[in-house]
Regions:
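Long, charged/polar, flexible scaffold/linker tracts and peripheral helical/loop segments
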Residues: 1-315
Length: 315
């Protein structure tokens, strides 16, 4: 935030001190072991990097084939402590996890699908709490809407410098802090570790984090909250896209149910510096392509997802 900025007078108050994301690592059942070996249950950093590479780049079948290579049979060669794919995945699952993944089976009354519908997801509110309290972003976050001037001209930068942030703050309780929600989705199918079933990832980040930091993939400011199932219904092709769109909205309702409550009623959560804030979570942007934007807005593909302009009025 610029030094000469004028902040909204009713925003960003602190209501005590809590625990940030780093503090909660001590709650893990293996925290005492990781004080000796930070890569536990892996033997060392090198073994952790190997396991991470296998999980991120190979399918489960490929991991099994790799670990059964005769290259590992030589007694003079180092062999990883994990000897099977299941052992590796169990170790990865035992690593500290702040927001657990869930699998929910969904059904549409009156409509059958070729394969069962399974949504892999996390509670979006818990993911946002994790992001908001991550010490990695402590020096790169803004909590108050502001107006910055330079040479008699208004300066615009991140979300908190926009008129929208100021106007939303006017409707929030005294002292509240906005945590603007930014969603991102991509129809690139994900099949690895999903048994060959196609899924589309949904990502979330918060507008408090500086845009330059959000754009760096290595800092993981974008977090995956769900893998949307790609299913085929046993219906006439004319109804296929309608049912798929309805399924998408049903999944989003489930993933973001608690986050919508926080947007309406607010909740308290600690920031990276452990200060507790009264937070509201308005949705301010959804980054996606045009076909998906029309589906989200529930309009036909020839209509504008943002305006009331008709097809004939398009430039």
């Amino acid at each position: 935030m610029p030094v000469n900025a004028t902040c909204h007078p009713q925003s960003g108050h602190v209501y005590g001190v809590g625990r940030n994301m780093l503090d909660k690592l001590d709650d893990d059942q293996y925290a005492h072991r990781r004080k000796i070996n930070p890569h536990y249950p892996f033997h060392d950093e090198g073994e952790w990097e190997l396991g991470k590479f296998l999980v991120e780049n190979l399918t489960q079948t490929q991991m099994t084939k790799f670990l059964k290579l005769k290259w590992f049979d030589c007694p003079n060669r180092a062999r990883p402590s994990f000897t099977t794919k299941d052992c590796l995945l169990d170790w990865v699952d035992s690593l500290p996890s702040f927001t657990p993944w869930k699998v929910s089976k969904l059904e549409f009354k009156g409509y059958k699908t070729v394969h069962p519908v399974e949504l892999v997801w996390r509670d979006a509110l818990e993911v946002v709490k994790q992001l908001f309290s991550d010490p990695t972003f402590a020096n790169h976050m803004t909590f108050r809407p502001h107006v910055a001037m330079a040479k008699n001209q208004r300066e615009y930068g991140d979300y908190m410098s926009a008129d929208m942030a100021w106007k939303i703050q006017d409707y929030l309780p005294f002292g509240a802090t906005q945590v603007p929600i930014i969603l991102g989705s991509d129809k690139t199918p994900v099949t690895r570790l999903a048994g060959g079933v196609e899924m589309h990832p949904i990502f979330v980040t918060i507008g408090n984090i500086d845009s330059e930091v959000r754009s760096k993939a290595t800092l993981r400011a974008w977090r995956c909250v769900a893998y949307m199932p790609v299913v085929k219904f046993r219906v006439h092709p004319d109804y296929q896209s309608i049912l798929q769109a309805r399924l998408w909205h049903k999944c989003m309702d489930l993933v973001f149910a608690n986050l919508k409550v926080a947007a309406k009623d607010g909740c308290f959560m600690p920031d990276p510096s452990r200060y507790i804030r009264h937070v509201f979570t308005p949705l301010v942007a959804h980054v996606c392509d045009l076909p998906e934007a029309t589906m989200i807005a529930a309009v036909s593909k020839n209509s504008s997802p943002l305006t009331m302009a008709t097809r004939q009025e398009h430039g």
